[in-house]
Amino acid sequence: MRVVRSQFRGCPRNCKRRADIEATERERSGRRWRPRPASQETGRRFNVTCGGGSAEDVILQVPHTDSAVTVAEHAPRRRWPVATLALFSLAALLAVLSLGAGPVALAPDTVTAALFGAGTEPHRIIVQEIRLPRAVLALAIGAILGLSGAALQGLLRNPLASPALFGAPQAAAFGAVVVIATGLADALSFALPVAAIAAAFVSVFVLLAVAGRNANLLILILAGLALSALAGAGTSLAVNLAPNPYAALEITFWLLGSLEDRSFQHVALALPFILAGAAILFANRNALRTLSLGEEAAQSLGVDVGRLRLAVIAGVALGVGGAVAVSGTIGFIGLVAPHLARPLLGYDPARLLLPSAAIGAALLLAADIAVRLIPATTDIKVGVLTAIIGVPFFLYLIVRDRRSLTGGLS
């Protein structure tokens, strides 16, 4: 049972003033549900956007037995800025620690001196040219993966959604693999990331051409799965047809996902796409919040649901494509980060975006530090470590939510 009451002020789309949108479910006994007194409301208040006007005082009343994810705020508003600042501070701390972690351990004072141009020449090279670009990329890539995961889970209203759902990361990996297999990566230093980003864009255009602008979520997901399978088959074919074993080995290592041997050239190439994708996703935060009320309610509040889907998919493809272009395939960060943010900040999709980005950055930085410190005969790739940690967590989510997931996608 769910009741939504909204009061509209100044909406240019002919919304009724003080209109009540009610979505009710009959109880098993057949009795009509009656609103509870205000003192017994289980939801909290928050603001949503209705076209050019505003819809204020939206209240969700959900019985305690309802296990569905709702947009009711389960955490006080004042907790959001403090928690978000704390999470970003944690990510920044891990970034600083990553500058000193590695085969050559550096003390904090040595790292600080080398960072500002003092200290010995070897220390400056290690910090400024080797570890600093790696830390910046880990921050940016982890943040866009966490942000994309939170946005997609809000769009689909499904806790198992991840950035790989619509095929952009797989297409980016296929583009990079083709460049490696043909030898262009050795001839042109920027050929690999440019090909990966271009392939991600092509996958989005094909997805939109196949599914159409007003396609529902099921068609978009099916088209995305088909593109993912096609990109995976193309990647396997490129490995199979590699001209020599060394090219096949290079492709395999790249697909494992890593931040090793990255420079500020990679940062300069990937960061604009990551920032552009993040800006698109963050600009649609209020529409994602409204969509949590349901598609019909969101449309009545002035949200163009079809445009919202296209914007979120394009933002995810743009940001994740830029990330995959320089790091390879790194999975499960986008799936795990929003779930770690929800116990702290509730289920409001708009308020989960920034905390999920901070948690994603912290997770990838922690994984990158761990692969440097784990004793092994060869370097463990960061994508392997995130998969080892992420797969059990994914299975746990399936077991926990299998009852609610049996209903399928609406």
Residue ranges and their predicted role:
Residues F8-C11, R28:
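Short linear/disordered segments characteristic of secreted peptide precursors
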